[in-house]
Amino acid sequence: MAITQERKTQLINEFKTHESDTGSPEVQIAILTDQINNLNEHLRTHKKDHHSRRGLLKMVGKRRNLLTYLRNKDVTRYRELINKLGLRR
């Protein structure tokens, strides 16, 4: 299921770096993580939905690229985000 506008606004408010921030890597990664988690739940019940699985793999790749960018740019922001989102256990 797609992410709702309220949930997206909530994620933006939680991860923004300044007042009018909507496109920082932190916000983009948080939104992608929420979408990935929702799609993961969908695929647990609909195992043969290969079209959605491809979309999931594209989202995971995009998130990986954004995480690599953030790690190269600022390691402390990267580590804070990883801990906040619960990634890389």
Swiss-Prot record:
First and last residue of the signal peptide: none
Pfam families attached to this UniProt entry: Ribosomal_S15
InterPro entries with a match to the protein in the record: Ribosomal_uS15, Ribosomal_uS15_bac-type, uS15_NS1_RNA-bd_sf
Any one GO biological process: translation
Listed SMART domains: Ribosomal_S15 (SM01387)
UniProtKB keywords: Ribonucleoprotein, Ribosomal protein, RNA-binding, rRNA-binding
One Gene Ontology cellular component annotation held by this UniProt entry: cytosolic small ribosomal subunit
GO terms, molecular function: rRNA binding; structural constituent of ribosome
Gene3D superfamilies: 6.10.250.3130, S15/NS1, RNA-binding
CDD domains per UniProt: Ribosomal_S15p_S13e (cd00353)
Assembly information from the UniProt record: Part of the 30S ribosomal subunit. Forms a bridge to the 50S subunit in the 70S ribosome, contacting the 23S rRNA.
Function noted in UniProt: One of the primary rRNA binding proteins, it binds directly to 16S rRNA where it helps nucleate assembly of the platform of the 30S subunit by binding and bridging several RNA helices of the 16S rRNA. Forms an intersubunit bridge (bridge B4) with the 23S rRNA of the 50S subunit in the ribosome.
Record family assignment: Belongs to the universal ribosomal protein uS15 family.
Annotated protein name in UniProt: Small ribosomal subunit protein uS15
Gene: rpsO
